[in-house]
C-alpha cells in the first residue's frame, strides 16, 4: 500500500522517531481522513503470556491519534497527549496488527482523537480516545 500524507515532512518526522523505529511501527497513511499504522508483533513485543504487551498497543494507539491530528494541523504546530484512555478487547497475538486513528474534534488549544488496533483477522484488539494539547513548534 502506498503512503499518502498531506505533508511529507510529517511522515518523515514520524518515520525517524526513535521509538517507532525501535518497535517497528510503519506509517502507511496520514491524511485528512486519519492515519494508518502497521506493526508485526514478534517475541520481543510480548508479555509473559505471549501476546502483545499493553505498552506496545498503547504506543500504537497514541501514535495513530497524534498523526491523525498532525495531518489536519498547520505544519508549524505539534501536539502532545494530555490524557488517554485505552480499552483492550482481545489479545494481540504474534503477527501483524493494524492501527488507525481519526480526529473527533480539532479545537483551538485542545484536540480529541480516537484510535483502534485490529489483528490480521480484523478482530478489534484495542481502542482508545485521547485529548491532545496543540502547540507551536517553531519549525515552520
Q: Which ranges hold each PLM region?
A:
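Terminal targeting signals and extreme-terminal segments of soluble enzymes
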Residues: 1-140
